[in-house]
Design a protein with these regions (language model features):
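Hydrophobic residues at beta-strand termini and immediately following loops
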Residues: 1, 73, 188
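Mid-domain, small-residue-enriched loop/turn segments at the edges of structured enzyme/sensor domains
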Residues: 12-20, 47-86
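A penicillin-recognizing enzyme superfamily signal
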Residues: 29, 79-86, 90-245
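Short secondary-structure junctions and interdomain/linker hinges
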Residues: 34-38, 49-50, 58, 62, ...
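Hydrophobic alpha-helix position signal
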Residues: 43, 54-55, 91
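Periplasmic/cell-envelope proteins involved in peptidoglycan metabolism and beta-lactam response
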Residues: 53-55, 292-299
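Composition-driven recognition of long, low-complexity, acid-poor segments enriched in small hydrophobic
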Residues: 216, 249-294
Length: 299
């Protein structure tokens, strides 16, 4: 893929932090290293209409997005972790995209199930395409921007993403890490509801969201079936060994672990309070207190 063209008429683009590599690189490397130039070059070659068609097929709302090359980098596309989890589930599910949902069932006070979510899925690509994408995205966690995100003793495929702030390219407004196994998709976003000069992230995804994602995935994955991928890592297929030394400083790890420990502790306190509320039969009053506690946790 083209990894050197930085200007298309009035549109200018560069790789994150101005990273320079070879003028042309294989697709698996472009994905693993989350490079902007190859993505824009691909949309330029295939056409913006194809990019919009793909976005809509994977459940993204493209109605208010400008039809410009920046769409290759997600420019103007509003999304959220749930939508991203649904989209990436198609790769984990061999081309079938399930409908993401929060509520699986609703029970009344007697425990009777009064409503159940009906699972549905649609094919958005064939199995061969999904397998090729997974093969390439396995490299994200072994040789690319997701090395710091890679959970110990587990194999994941996926993608990272970073958005620079408009007022300082050294700061970021959004950090994404999305990883999946054949059993589960974990979609993680780090940022502020509104980014300004008082609210921004001072690190890149590999030094920020990555460490939180790793801790989250190492907590979740032991409770999954542990299915393994049937495709090989594209780096391995091309004779390249994994760069399995994590990009993580002890300070970054201790800060992240401390944050997660604090969240887990507060969450457990909330659960304990909910249990006491039920046992004391003061449901309404106690439930409000518990809810207020949850809200305070995220303020």
């Amino acid at each position: 893929l083209d990894n050197h063209t930085m200007k298309y008429d009035n549109y200018k683009v560069d790789n994150y932090a101005g990273i320079k590599t070879a003028p042309e690189i294989p697709m698996y490397q472009a994905l693993a290293e989350s490079l902007n130039l190859p993505a824009v070059a691909t949309v330029k070659e295939l056409g913006i209409d194809k990019a919009f068609e793909a976005g809509e097929k994977f459940g993204l709302n493209m109605s208010s997005v400008d039809r410009v090359l920046g769409v290759a980098l997600g420019g103007g596309v509003e999304t959220n972790p749930l939508q991203m989890a649904q989209a990436y589930a198609a790769f984990a599910n061999e081309g079938l995209m399930p409908e993401a949902h929060f509520i699986t069932r609703i029970e009344n006070a007697s425990g009777q199930v009064i409503a159940t979510h009906k699972n549905s899925q649609k094919r958005v690509m064939d199995k061969s395409t999904a397998d090729k994408m997974t093969s390439m995205m396995l490299g994200t966690f072994t040789n690319g921007t997701g090395i710091s995100s890679s959970p110990e003793n587990y194999v994941m495929a996926g993608k990272t993403g970073t958005t620079e702030t408009v007022f300082n390219p050294e700061y970021t407004s959004d950090q994404w890490v999305i990883g999946y196994t054949p059993d589960v998709v974990i979609s993680h976003w780090l940022g502020f509801p509104t980014t300004d000069e008082s609210h921004y992230l001072s690190s890149s995804t590999s030094n920020g969201a990555a460490h939180i994602f790793r801790n989250i995935s190492e907590t979740i994955l032991p409770y999954t079936p542990g299915s393994t991928f049937t495709v090989k890592n594209a780096y391995e297929l091309n004779g390249i060994a994994p760069a399995n030394i994590k990009n993580q400083t002890p300070n970054a790890e201790s800060q992240t672990d401390g944050l997660l420990t604090d969240i887990r502790s507060k969450a457990q306190n909330i659960v304990d309070e909910a249990g006491r509320a039920i046992s004391e039969a003061k449901i309404k009053e106690k439930a409000q207190t518990v809810w207020d506690t949850i809200v305070d946790l995220f303020r």
